[in-house]
Amino acid sequence: MTISEKSNESELYGERFISDAEIVCFPNPSPNRTYEISIELPEFTCQCPFSGYPDFAIIRLLYQPGEKVLELKSMKLYVNSFRNRKISHEEVANKMLDDFVAAANPSWMQLEADFNPRGNVHTVVRVSHGLKNNC
């Protein structure tokens, strides 16, 4: 059996990991200290819900953790789960923020979805949760 025959026959392991993705957290090692965590995911893709064309973006997450911290590999898999999903820029930014907040319950969180220009239009969607404290 060739590789292409095998891949047509069953779900690839990467597809399986993405479809099973759930956001994982671990205990904050310094819960009594106010600090920020900055994460950038530069290869985000989804599909335009109107044209079906691919949209590409850099997702930037900045947050002040509470009792839990987001685990990076699970975030990557979660973000990759949007690859074949038809979703607007605004909806994806709000959905991701809601899901990250539900998982980690941060003191403060901001998510920025910086989409590549298309048709001479550059869109950046910024959403936030909670009140930011000085570090």
From Swiss-Prot:
<comment type="similarity">
    <text>Belongs to the GTP cyclohydrolase I family. QueF type 1 subfamily.</text>
</comment>
<dbReference type="InterPro" id="IPR050084">
    <property type="entry name" value="NADPH_dep_7-cyano-7-deazaG_red"/>
</dbReference>
<feature type="active site" description="Thioimide intermediate">
    <location>
        <position position="48"/>
    </location>
</feature>
<protein>
    <recommendedName>
        <fullName>NADPH-dependent 7-cyano-7-deazaguanine reductase</fullName>
        <ecNumber>1.7.1.13</ecNumber>
    </recommendedName>
</protein>
<feature type="binding site">
    <location>
        <begin position="89"/>
        <end position="90"/>
    </location>
    <ligand>
        <name>substrate</name>
    </ligand>
</feature>
<dbReference type="Pfam" id="PF14489">
    <property type="entry name" value="QueF"/>
</dbReference>
<comment type="function">
    <text>Catalyzes the NADPH-dependent reduction of 7-cyano-7-deazaguanine (preQ0) to 7-aminomethyl-7-deazaguanine (preQ1).</text>
</comment>
<feature type="binding site">
    <location>
        <begin position="70"/>
        <end position="72"/>
    </location>
    <ligand>
        <name>substrate</name>
    </ligand>
</feature>
<comment type="pathway">
    <text>tRNA modification; tRNA-queuosine biosynthesis.</text>
</comment>
<keyword id="KW-0560">Oxidoreductase</keyword>
<dbReference type="InterPro" id="IPR043133">
    <property type="entry name" value="GTP-CH-I_C/QueF"/>
</dbReference>
<dbReference type="InterPro" id="IPR016856">
    <property type="entry name" value="QueF_type1"/>
</dbReference>
<dbReference type="GO" id="GO:0008616">
    <property type="term" value="P:queuosine biosynthetic process"/>
</dbReference>
<feature type="active site" description="Proton donor">
    <location>
        <position position="55"/>
    </location>
</feature>
<dbReference type="InterPro" id="IPR029500">
    <property type="entry name" value="QueF"/>
</dbReference>
<keyword id="KW-0671">Queuosine biosynthesis</keyword>
<dbReference type="GO" id="GO:0006400">
    <property type="term" value="P:tRNA modification"/>
</dbReference>
<keyword id="KW-0963">Cytoplasm</keyword>
<dbReference type="GO" id="GO:0005737">
    <property type="term" value="C:cytoplasm"/>
</dbReference>
<dbReference type="GO" id="GO:0033739">
    <property type="term" value="F:preQ1 synthase activity"/>
</dbReference>
<keyword id="KW-0521">NADP</keyword>
